Each structure stands twice: as structure tokens, then as C-alpha cells.
């Protein structure tokens, strides 16, 4: 896979670096049976109030139904296409199973059209794209799409280029220790499933949109500095000209301390599953 720098030296293209999709993706159209309409919310709730800042606009898109559970056991599937998904940073693959069923999965790095994949338990080979419980995956194996609880579907390590490393059983033999991308070491139930390999599109981090309009196409609205606002809109607002923050530490728009402050609630039940905090 490769990225390409746009050689056009106009203002909107000068810094642009994009992934070369033509060298990676197939030219097939999305599978219609796995598409659903995706209404736009623009970051608003049912009262019209902003609940998520910087959302709105963007190109119309349809949602691709992804098989995060990978629960079609002991039936081989064939990779028919590798496609772009506007709803995530990774690529997706269309899998056609031996019984004719079609499903989308998150495409692992290195998967090719025609490759065979399978899901199951202890009898499954440790090969790229196969899915099985953590207890049957050897130490040091890189995995993605990890379940937080058995049969819930993968929720961890799904973005472009992400992977987690299996460290082995804990002392109780009920949990598997997994090192996540952030450096956090976490315990997972040994029955939780994961998929072998690293998520595709690992060079997404090298992309440079080049211009504000590209962000707007993606549905991302501008981020305004707090110091450029009025004091009734942000704690940093007001003052004459480019005034300093005027307090001992930066604040969020809602007045809480910002930057370097731990925000995790230690009373969460899942805190007991974290062996080592992220860096």
C-alpha cells in the first residue's frame, strides 16, 4: 500500500497527502443487501440542541452492516472484494460463505481477493482474518476486533492500522491479558473472540487533507478557539485583543480543567479489568 503526494501546487493541494486507493481497493459496487440509510443528525438531539460539537454537513452516505460478531462458525468464506467505507477509517471486505450468505468484515492488513477465512474454536488455524476465542490464540499474536464480553461483537481495536498483542493468561486462568495500542494492558474474558491480524489502511495516519473543504466533505465542522469567543461562550473568552487565559490552567467549554487531567471515573466496574493504565 502507498500514499501519494499531490503534485498540483495550488493552495488547496500543496500539502495534500492521500492514500492511493486505486492500488488497494476493488472496483466492485457495494453489496445492496448490506446497505441501510443513515439519517444525518448534525450533532443535534431530538430537541435540536448540540450534543456533539463539530458535526454537520458532509457527503451523503449509507451505512454498511458489518459482522463484528464473526459467529458463523466452521464455514469457510471467500474474500470477494476490498472496499472503501465512508463510516470508518479502515477498509472493509465482502465475504461470501460456502452456503451463499454474504457479510462485510473489517479488512485485515494483507488480505487479498480470493483468500479463505473461517471462524470457530480451538480447531481453527492461526491465519490472517480467522476469528476465534482469545484462549486459543498463542502469545505475542497480533489481533483486532476484540469483544469486551462474550458474544457481544468486537468493540476494541477496529480503527485503521490498529492491533493488540496477546500476552497470555492471568494467574486465575479465567482471563487473557492483552496489550492495546495505547499501551494499556487489560484483562478480557477468555471466551471473548478476536480476529487475527492488524486492521487495514495503516497509512491513514500519514494522510493530510490539504484544505478545509475536504474536512467539510467528511462532515467535520470548524473548531473555534475558546480565546476567540465571548466570555459567555467559553471560560477563555473576552479580554482586550489576544488576552491570556487568565486562570491557573486551561478549561473546557464547560469550565472543567483541561489538558493533562485524568478523566476516567475510577468507580466504573471495568476499572478492575485494567492491569496497567495507558501511557
Curated annotation (Swiss-Prot):
Ranges of biased composition (kind: Basic residues): 254-267
Species whose genome carries this gene: Ureaplasma urealyticum serovar 10 (strain ATCC 33699 / Western)
Assigned protein family: Belongs to the universal ribosomal protein uL2 family.
GO molecular function: rRNA binding; structural constituent of ribosome; transferase activity
Name of a matching Pfam family: Ribosomal_L2_C
Residue stretches in coiled coil: none
InterPro entries: NA-bd_OB-fold, Rib_uL2_dom2, Ribosomal_uL2, Ribosomal_uL2_bac/org-type, Ribosomal_uL2_C, Ribosomal_uL2_CS, Ribosomal_uL2_dom3, Ribosomal_uL2_RNA-bd_dom
Keywords: Ribonucleoprotein, Ribosomal protein, RNA-binding, rRNA-binding
Upper taxonomic lineage: Bacteria, Bacillati, Mycoplasmatota, Mycoplasmoidales, Mycoplasmoidaceae
Subunit structure: Part of the 50S ribosomal subunit. Forms a bridge to the 30S subunit in the 70S ribosome.
GO terms for biological process, alphabetical: cytoplasmic translation
TM helices/strands, residue ranges: none
Database matches in NCBIfam families: rplB_bact
HAMAP family with a match to the protein in the record: Ribosomal_uL2_B
Residue span of region Disordered: 223-279
Keyword check for RNA-binding: yes
Entry GO terms, CC: large ribosomal subunit
Functional description taken from the UniProt entry: One of the primary rRNA binding proteins. Required for association of the 30S and 50S subunits to form the 70S ribosome, for tRNA binding and peptide bond formation. It has been suggested to have peptidyltransferase activity; this is somewhat controversial. Makes several contacts with the 16S rRNA in the 70S ribosome.
Stated name of the protein: Large ribosomal subunit protein uL2
Gene3D superfamilies listed in its UniProt record: 2.30.30.30, Nucleic acid-binding proteins (2.40.50.140), Ribosomal protein L2, domain 3 (4.10.950.10)
Keyword rRNA-binding: yes
